[in-house]
Every structure is written in C-alpha cells, then in structure tokens.
C-alpha cells in the first residue's frame, strides 16, 4: 500500500515537472533592440546586419525567441527615450538591448544627459519586466582622451548602478584593430557587411547569459 502511494506520488511529480518544463519552453521570449544606424543596417543589404544574423543564430539553436529591431539611423539616447514606452507596451519584450549613445557624442550632447537617458531607459525596461543588455561605445582618439574616457565610462556607470549586463565595447575587433578601415564603409563610420558577424560575436556571449 505504501509502495503504491509512493509510486503514484513520484509519477505525479514527474508529470508536473514535465508540464512545467513544457510550459517554460513554450513561453515566448522577445528581444527588443533599441539602437541607431549600427543596428539599423545603414548602407547594408537588407538582412545582413548583426540583428538579422542574431535572428538566424537563435533559429539555428532552436531557441524560441522573437527579435524586434526598433533601431533608427541617427537615433540619440533622447530619441530612444521618447520611443521606449510605446515599444515596451507594444512588444512586451523579455529582453532589451540598448545600443545608443554614439550619436550623442558625435553631436556633442552633454554627457550627463546621455547618462540620464541611458539610466531612464534601463529603469523603464526593468520595470516592464525585461532584462537589459547595454552595448557600450568608445570614441575615436581625436575626440580627446579625457572625453573618450568619460564617454566610455557612462555605460559602465549605468550598468553598475542598475545592475544590468554590459558589453563594454560593441565594436571590439572591428574599430580597434590596425587595419580597421577595411571593415568600414566609405564614410569611415558605419561597419561593412563583413564586420556584422564580428559585432554579433561580441553581443552573443553577453546576451546568452541573460536569455
């Protein structure tokens, strides 16, 4: 009698565990990418940018993850901030990748404002139940060592204060190599198609940790 009860109890637990496992596996996940031209396929054939390659990699790994690319060329952190609430409500992402800030620096916007916008977007994403990955950027040496250091530090400060994931330099292995020019379009600002897999390889390990 005791054996029969124990056996039925174990079977019930196994069935429940299987049900929960299936439920979790079936739970849809959505990654929202909020970025600028580096994520919007500027100057590239459609479907060749790192975000499109991310979709392909997730599919190859049979991960049920939907990717929404809400990136716009020329976007600043202020622009991203103004659009974020509507994007969160519409797509209800489980993960948000924020790739913004480069255009703020190129336009000479105040660093304090950039940091405040990044913090706000991170906080709102977290309040919506999403896990956040910040993609850090660095400026060329001609902007000055002090400015470059302070700009790069913004991303570290936000990630640390908000306790979110950080990729310190999105263009590592692309913009910081001796022959970097070959990986950039003629404007020397936007990476080529050849650089996109390298950019994804930078993002992937950090994203995979929080998926």
Regions found by a protein language model. Name each.
Residues 1-13:
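Bacterial N-terminal signal peptides that target proteins for export
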Residues 3, 63, 81-211:
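Alpha-helical cap/lid subdomain in secreted, periplasmic
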Residues 14, 78-81:
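Short gly/ser/thr-rich secondary-structure transition/capping motifs
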Residues 15-23:
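Hydrophobic h-region of N-terminal signal peptides that target proteins for export
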Residues 25-73, 83-92:
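Serine-esterase "nucleophile elbow" of acetyl-processing enzymes
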Residues 43, 68-77, 105-109, 188:
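Acidic/histidine-rich helix-loop elements
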